[in-house]
Amino acid sequence: MKTYSFFVLFIVFIFFISSSKSHSKKHVRFLCATKAVKHIRKVCPDMCLTGEEVEVNEFCKMGYSDSQIKYICCPE
């Protein structure tokens, strides 16, 4: 009986772990925003010289190409 109970609890535990999310949405947005800012600084080292801000949330949702970032931030 103890073995059967342990086995059932073990299966329920595994099911619970597999169905839970590994990261919250807030954590994922934070990671994306951090990576986006680092990438923008790599493309435009002086950040936005035009005074125009690259919308980090849009960068995370849609993705900007390097040429779009240069056009917005540091046109030549």
From Swiss-Prot:
Cysteine pairs bridged by disulfides in the record: 32-60, 44-73, 48-74
Compartments (UniProt record): Secreted
Keywords: Disulfide bond, Secreted, Signal
GO annotation, cellular component aspect: extracellular region
Primary localization class, coarse: secreted
Residues annotated as signal peptide: 1-24
Disulfide bond listed as a keyword: yes
Gene3D superfamilies: Insulin-like
Family: Belongs to the insulin family.
Protein name: Probable insulin-like peptide alpha-type 1
Organism: Caenorhabditis elegans
Gene that encodes it: ins-21
